[in-house]
């Protein structure tokens, strides 16, 4: 089986990361000091590379119909909101645009639910990077990274928005414990470096 590289593979090499194979992807396990990284997660902010997650975009007038076949209830989501099941989450970005995140390797089972897609459907897994920001200071890192007001009373858990972080266009999905950033693979290393600089 062909092993896929994370868009942060250059960062991994530069910082001597210990890597592990995750569902066919070579991903960072730690950067040499797991205890320090765990403490940082509890007290500061950490970035986890989740680029191995499956990413599928749907666009067009029938996107909601196709999204519904993939994730039950997705057609009823309001714009800039989300719906999740056990393996996937659907982001409704506009009236006619969705982005689905799913467990690594689960893309095909989602795509198999559509015998005849009625929307433009693209498997974006290899084309997009994905980070998860965790820890109590992640809000500070995001505040220093964008001009958009991301206060938790304005952007609640379950919300999704599109914004620019350090000149990189991102889709931001907020949960209770994490902020998940989906972006173009091309800009993964520069976004990672910029987030590290502010946090």
Regions found by a protein language model. Name each.
Residues 1-199:
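Basic, glycine/lysine-rich polyanion-binding surfaces/domains
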